[in-house]
Amino acid sequence: MIIGRDKEQRELHEAYESEYSEFAVVYGRRRVGKTFLVRETFNYTFTFEHSGVAKGNMRVQLRAFRDSLADAGMGKVKVPEDWMEAFSLLRQLIRQSKERKKVVFIDEIPWMDTPRSNFVSAIEYFWNNFASARKDVLLIICGSATSWIINKVLKNHGGLHNRVTYRLPVMPFTLYECEQYMKSRKIQASHYDLLEYYMVFGGVPFYWSLLTRGQSVAQNVDRLIFAEDGKLRYEFNELYDSLFHNPEKYVRIVMELGEKGSGMTRDELVKQCGLEENGRTSRMLEDLEECGFIRKIPTYG
């Protein structure tokens, strides 16, 4: 059962019903329910589904891709030598499919782009020379490494420039959606309790899924965050590591803003965090904003 996400589901259904091939990008911070959203929307049924391997090298990624092709009915094939060959096999699978719309779901795609793999060039070629030339392919890519999605796909200046037809940022739940989620799990909580939970966990569905019925707010928080074996004890560092390459400066920005409490101007942030006034800093701030960690408020006067 999906709580909220009405707009995202509507757009995915619209892409599926389109008379043309469509390219959808689903992205957002870790634990926010991106994969669950896509799988639930399509009832866990895809022409091809694959997920990148965390910290796997190119050979590991290609072997996993081969295995996903086999799971999709490709039959026994050798491990591709490179990504061009891998996507050539995917083209064969799509040609063989009798489905009206061929839904291709590639999850955790940033992990597949290993050094010197030419992965982005291969997926550019797959889309531009094959999928977009047909009318029956829905390509959905998904990832938590938002900076990769933004810079390598959404702001691509090469073969993927302006190719994405559906851009779906998945944001944390609102307070109302968190209340609906708690009701769906039959966990009773007063409005005050909900507010306390929201101040601790934000609107991240995975965190709320760990709450135990019958425990108080303090008991749940202590068990999940402060206990030695707490499931969220090390979540802070793991979260930034999963989202950003070289996350230290991202963490510094968020920590400085958190300590200030009332917000900071860009110039204040640059000075306080020891950043350089350049495009790299702009990209970091944009990445954090896209992930929902910070919010830019224009000043007037």
Where are these regions (language model features)?
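Phosphate-binding site recognition
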Residues: 1-301
